[in-house]
């Protein structure tokens, strides 16, 4: 049987308000992660590693940095007809923006008609995980379903925070799609677990087009993939679930198999970054068999400067990117993006520093996220006194993480 023709559609229009101020000037999928990456690099790496090389990224809010990253990083071979391209709202159906995720695809159906795929893979743009989507596509073709929804096994007590999939006794046919239910249904054979929707879908093309047209004609719809399109197909008994726990990615360890994180809040974003710094992180960035791909800035290697025991540049349990200079300062359990400088006697602890942050002499940064080009003057502190951080206008999360937006100079 010949391989199906697959088109990837990545939904990247989210505003990411819960990640503010990190999303003040960028779309959520463009938020940096892990030192070198952007959140969108994870889904694009999964699709490209699987050989799916025709991908449209549907964008909307504050998309400039996202568009620039995609066009400069994700360049495919035009000779072979491959592409990864950002597609902003085109207003093809009238003078309006996307009204929801389903409307974004409906307004972009010309992409589907032009490519003429057998299968359309619709994935979200802002989760951290590895996945081989070929296995999900294979199950979809074998099952004969109109849509297959990726399901993540979570404890029933956690299912209240997700859209939840209720299956038939066969464990595969979807009987109901429930939005944040008070009493999530258990799984056949595993009653204390439930399927949370990962927001990843595989559609047979004709089924997708028909569902989008019907949804567009429904004046009561909010035009959402999870809220409208999937329930429509569930009612037609045309929806199946794909158990993400069975997805085997080359090179994965026992610990990171099945890893998937929604980093839509400051605290979940920070926690996922800190996991990378652990002695034995759950998510392994260093899997060469299924790499997370991105563009690497042309900067020199990281440098650690010391001139004796009184002034020693050190970094422990940390990710240190190229172009970083730790000049006599101390870094612990932190993620440092390219171009960061930590000056003499400064302390950086349990912190994320994005590109070109400057930490001055004797400064202290703790339990914080500093966006690009932030300047911490000599002797200044951030993240040490949360009440003072709030008084200075900085965001402090529920779990006490101080977030400072782009280009800010920390006040004394």
From Swiss-Prot:
Reaction(s) this enzyme catalyzes, per UniProt: alpha-D-glucose 1-phosphate + ATP + H(+) = ADP-alpha-D-glucose + diphosphate
* Parts forming coiled coils: none
- Record's superkingdom? Bacteria
The gene is glgC
Q: Which UniProt keywords apply?
A: ATP-binding, Carbohydrate metabolism, Glycogen biosynthesis, Glycogen metabolism, Nucleotide-binding, Nucleotidyltransferase, Transferase
Pfam families documented for this protein? Hexapep_GlmU, NTP_transferase
What does this protein's UniProt record list under function? Involved in the biosynthesis of ADP-glucose, a building block required for the elongation reactions to produce glycogen. Catalyzes the reaction between ATP and alpha-D-glucose 1-phosphate (G1P) to produce pyrophosphate and ADP-Glc.
Query: Pathway of this protein?
Result: Glycan biosynthesis; glycogen biosynthesis
User: Which GO MF terms are attached to this record?
Assistant: ATP binding; glucose-1-phosphate adenylyltransferase activity
HAMAP family given in the database record: GlgC
Q: What is this protein called?
A: Glucose-1-phosphate adenylyltransferase
E.C. number? 2.7.7.27
Q: Which Gene3D superfamilies match?
A: Hexapeptide repeat proteins, Spore Coat Polysaccharide Biosynthesis Protein SpsA, Chain A
InterPro entries under this entry? ADP-Glc_PPase, ADP_Glu_pyroP_CS, GlgC_bac, GlmU/GlgC-like_hexapep, NTP_transferase_dom, Nucleotide-diphossugar_trans, Trimer_LpxA-like_sf
**Can you tell me which residues bind alpha-D-glucose 1-phosphate?**
163, 179-180, 197
Regarding protein family, the annotation reads:
Belongs to the bacterial/plant glucose-1-phosphate adenylyltransferase family.
Q: Does the keyword Coiled coil apply?
A: no
């Amino acid at each position: 049987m010949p391989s199906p023709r697959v088109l990837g559609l990545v939904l990247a229009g989210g505003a990411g308000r819960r990640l503010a101020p990190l999303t003040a000037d960028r779309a959520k999928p463009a938020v940096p992660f892990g030192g070198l990456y952007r959140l969108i690099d994870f889904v694009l790496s999964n699709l490209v590693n699987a050989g799916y090389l025709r991908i449209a990224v549907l964008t909307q809010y504050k998309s400039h940095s996202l568009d620039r990253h995609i066009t400069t990083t994700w360049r495919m071979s035009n000779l072979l007809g491959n592409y990864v391209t950002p597609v902003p709202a085109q207003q093809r159906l009238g003078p309006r923006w996307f009204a929801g995720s389903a409307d974004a695809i409906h307004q972009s159906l010309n992409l589907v008609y032009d490519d003429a795929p057998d299968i359309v893979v619709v994935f979200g743009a802002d989760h951290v995980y590895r996945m081989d989507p070929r296995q999900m596509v294979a199950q979809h073709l074998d099952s004969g379903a109109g849509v297959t929804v990726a399901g993540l096994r979570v404890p029933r007590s956690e299912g209240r925070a997700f859209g939840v999939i209720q299956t038939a006794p066969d464990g595969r046919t979807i009987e109901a799609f429930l939005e944040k239910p008070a009493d999530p249904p258990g799984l056949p054979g595993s009653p204390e677990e439930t399927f949370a929707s990962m927001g990843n879908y595989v559609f047979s093309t004709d089924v997708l087009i028909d569902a989008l047209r019907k949804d567009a004609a429904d004046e009561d719809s909010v035009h959402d993939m999870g809220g409208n399109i999937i329930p429509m197909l569930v009612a037609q008994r045309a929806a199946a679930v794909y158990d993400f726990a069975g997805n085997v990615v080359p090179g994965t360890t026992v610990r990171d198999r099945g890893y998937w994180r929604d980093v839509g809040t400051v605290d979940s974003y920070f926690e996922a970054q800190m996991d990378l710094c652990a002695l034995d992180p759950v998510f392994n960035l260093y899997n060469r068999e299924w790499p997370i791909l991105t563009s690497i800035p042309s900067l020199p290697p990281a440098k650690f400067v010391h001139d004796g025991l009184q002034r020693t540049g050190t970094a422990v349990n940390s990710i240190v990117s190229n172009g970083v200079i730790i000049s006599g300062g101390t870094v612990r359990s932190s993620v440092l993006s390219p171009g960061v400088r930590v000056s003499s006697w400064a302390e950086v602890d349990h912190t994320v520093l994005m590109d070109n942050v400057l930490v001055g002499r004797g400064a202290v940064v703790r339990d914080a996220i500093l966006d690009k080009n932030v300047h911490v003057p000599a002797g200044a502190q951030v993240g040490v006194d949360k009440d003072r951080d709030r008084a200075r206008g900085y965001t402090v999360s529920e779990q006490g993480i101080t977030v400072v937006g782009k280009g800010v100079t920390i006040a004394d």
